[in-house]
């Protein structure tokens, strides 16, 4: 039970990072910013303990790129005499996302002993499915919607005005883009990870998450259809079904997929 509650807490951290939102009492501070500040504090604390802060070569390259991009945008804005400096502060947004990501990886590693792509995909898929379910609950039950709208500030007045589904921090195109990314990652697991392909319940869980996100995610944001299309293309190209030949290691995947399609279409 404790393990399950801990995993649920980690999922809430992932959701707060991937689908940031604000509380009504602090509308200017969203969960991503809060996680970023916590991430900076963690980096400083660990650096103090180890007497040094290290960066990987890839991360250092990304940081340099962020500063170069911001500098180019500053020069462009100054040269064109424009007052729009939105992209000049891109490096601030970069470090905000980076700090939040550090916290996500930290809590996953603290509980599981490691932070791998598979674990990140699993938590992200669970969060996306949860957001889809929350969106349906908010839409169908006015009492639940009132509860969410009372304590969560996410511009829900506009969502209600245009008649769109929304979760907690998940709405419109930003949600669609993130749903699309997770759909592609789920297909990656189904096609490339032997540990998923050879275990029936893992294959079923991934396919179930894919279906839920594809269907309800499209109701939240039609941008999700981009991830659905690319995911199907990835699946077809990786498994070789377009050659009308199914490789042995994909038989389990297609048998479960076929069964789920029959159930969902009945």
Region roles according to the model:
Residues 40-53, 103-114, 187-196, 233-245:
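Structural signal for the C-terminal ends of transmembrane alpha-helices
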Residues 139, 236-266:
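A membrane-periplasm/extracellular boundary helix in multi-pass inner-membrane enzymes
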Residues 15-24, 154-170:
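Juxtamembrane membrane-water interface segments that cap and precede transmembrane helices
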Residues 1-49, 71-77:
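N-terminal signal-anchor transmembrane segment
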Residues 61-68, 82-106, 119-123, 128:
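Aromatic-anchored transmembrane helix interface
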Residues 1-9, 51-66, 116-123, 200-205:
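Membrane-interfacial loop-to-transmembrane alpha-helix junctions, especially the N-terminal start
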Residues 118-149, 169-220, 224-241:
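Alpha-helical transmembrane segments of multi-pass inner-membrane proteins
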Residues 28-46, 91-100, 176-184, 226-233:
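Membrane-embedded alpha-helical segments of multi-pass membrane proteins
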């Amino acid at each position: 039970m404790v393990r399950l509650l801990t995993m649920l807490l980690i999922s809430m951290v992932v959701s707060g990072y991937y689908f940031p939102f604000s509380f009504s009492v602090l509308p200017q501070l969203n969960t991503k910013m809060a996680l970023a500040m916590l991430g900076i504090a963690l980096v400083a604390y660990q650096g103090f303990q180890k007497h040094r802060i290290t960066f990987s070569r890839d991360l250092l390259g990304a940081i340099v790129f962020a500063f170069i991009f911001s500098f180019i945008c500053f020069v462009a804005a100054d040269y064109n005499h424009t007052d729009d400096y939105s992209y000049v502060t891109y490096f601030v947004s970069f470090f905000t996302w980076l700090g939040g990501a550090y916290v996500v990886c930290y809590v996953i590693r603290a509980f599981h002993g490691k932070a791998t792509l598979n674990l990140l995909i699993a938590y992200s898929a669970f969060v996306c499915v949860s957001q889809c379910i929350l969106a349906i609950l908010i839409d169908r039950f006015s009492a639940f919607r009132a509860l969410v709208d009372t304590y969560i500030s996410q511009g829900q007045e506009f969502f209600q005005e245009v008649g769109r589904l929304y979760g907690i921090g998940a709405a419109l195109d930003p949600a669609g883009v993130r749903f699309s990314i997770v759909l592609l990652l789920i297909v990656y697991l189904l096609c490339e990870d032997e540990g998923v392909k050879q275990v029936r319940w893992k294959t079923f869980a991934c396919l179930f998450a894919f279906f839920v996100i594809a269907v309800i995610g499209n109701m939240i944001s039609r941008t999700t259809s981009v991830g659905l299309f690319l995911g199907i293309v990835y699946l077809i190209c990786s498994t070789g079904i377009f050659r009308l030949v199914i490789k042995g290691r994909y038989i389990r995947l297609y048998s479960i997929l076929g069964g789920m399609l029959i159930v969902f279409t009945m």
